[in-house]
From Swiss-Prot:
GO terms for biological process: endoplasmic reticulum to Golgi vesicle-mediated transport; intra-Golgi vesicle-mediated transport; protein localization to axon; protein transport; retrograde vesicle-mediated transport, Golgi to endoplasmic reticulum. Keywords: Cytoplasm, Cytoplasmic vesicle, ER-Golgi transport, Golgi apparatus, Membrane, Phosphoprotein, Protein transport, Transport, Ubl conjugation. The keyword Membrane applies. Gene3D superfamilies: Tetratricopeptide repeat domain (1.25.40.10). The coatomer is a cytosolic protein complex that binds to dilysine motifs and reversibly associates with Golgi non-clathrin-coated vesicles, which further mediate biosynthetic protein transport from the ER, via the Golgi up to the trans Golgi network. The coatomer complex is required for budding from Golgi membranes, and is essential for the retrograde Golgi-to-ER transport of dilysine-tagged proteins. Polyubiquitinated by RCHY1 in the presence of androgen, leading to proteasomal degradation. Belongs to the COPE family. The modification Phosphoserine is found at residues 13, 45. It comes from the Eukaryota. It is a peripheral membrane protein. It holds the Pfam family Coatomer_E. GO terms for molecular function: structural molecule activity. This is Coatomer subunit epsilon.
Length: 308
């Protein structure tokens, strides 16, 4: 099924969603477009203005512009915006992360307003970045929004729980099968299923790119489909297009590192991408895991080194 075209979409009640373009841009990873739309759109109520600001500041977080979020969201701001600020604070200040998680645990142990979808999403994001997917899933299961379900699917797929991800996708499709988020989640699940579903996943990423914009998220999705089908050279071309858009994008660089191995590229090519990733994202989980494996290898090598 084709994804929705950009424009004002109607909800089930027939009402036009004034923030459709803002949300759609965010969901496909077109963060600057999301910011531009958010600054341009005229809204009918203060509640919608808060919702707009949530997406505006989340887009700044996605661009790693944490200072904007921390400076502009005040103690007097709405609870939804406080939740966004918490996530920005967690990402921006590494030495405060443990304290932020402790405070979040305290808040989760009290009565949580489950209608505050933004809080659930931001809390789950903190937990997931803190290597606690179980807490993230428990948090998301308290919400029933498409975005909570989409994030649940992402986490389940990272945990290799395709069975549970498919059940969650069915719930999304029952709620709104034409929504951009549902289309993306369908592509993620199809990518995990593999086989003939890979082409279906590719078509979703391609159609969204054609109708909206070929973002880094969509290009990496297309490249993953090509790679899973053994089309390594085609995947490399798509990833190079993504790299042209952002030379420090972590997912693109990680995919190029993996791809270089499959294509038998010289070691210096792989090392170049690895250096770019280290420069831009020194604390990225991939880098931490890579360095841990390097240390393990060095330790093993010492054990088998010839004695003098």
């Amino acid at each position: 099924m084709a994804p929705p075209a950009p424009g004002a979409a109607s909800g089930g009640s027939g009402e036009v969603d004034e923030l459709f373009d803002v949300k759609n841009a965010f969901y496909i990873g077109s963060y600057q477009q999301c910011i531009n739309e958010a600054q341009r759109v005229k809204l009918s109520s203060p509640d919608r203005e808060v919702e707009r600001d949530v997406f505006l500041y989340r887009a700044y977080i996605a661009q790693r512009k944490y200072g904007v979020v921390l400076d502009e969201i005040k103690p007097s701001s709405a609870p939804e915006l406080q939740a966004v600020r918490m996530f920005a604070d967690y990402l921006a200040t590494e030495n405060r992360r443990d304290a932020i998680v402790v405070e979040l645990d305290r808040e989760m142990s009290r009565s949580v307003d489950v209608t505050n979808t933004t809080f659930l999403l931001m809390a789950a994001s903190v937990y997931f970045h803190d290597q606690n997917p179980d807490a993230a899933l428990r948090t998301l299961h308290q919400g029933d929004s498409l975005e909570c379900m989409a994030m649940t699917i992402q986490i389940l797929l990272k945990l290799d729980r395709l069975d549970l991800a498919r059940k969650e996708l069915k719930k999304m499709q029952d709620q709104d099968e034409d929504a951009t988020l549902t289309q993306l989640a369908t592509a993620w699940v199809n990518l995990a299923v593999g086989g003939e579903k890979l082409q279906e996943a590719y078509y979703i990423f391609q159609e969204l790119a054609d109708k909206c914009s070929p973002t880094l998220l969509l290009l990496n999705g297309q490249a993953a489909c090509h790679s899973a089908q053994g089309r390594w050279e085609t995947a490399e071309g798509v990833l190079q297009e993504a790299l042209d858009k952002d030379s420090g994008h972590p997912e693109t660089l990680i995919n190029l590192i993996v791809l270089s191995q499959h294509l038998g590229k010289p070691p210096e090519v792989t090392n170049r991408y690895l250096s770019q990733l280290k420069d831009a994202h020194r604390t990225h989980p991939f880098i931490k895991e890579y360095q841990a494996k390097e240390n393990d290898f060095d330790r093993l090598a010492l054990q088998y080194a010839p004695s003098a």
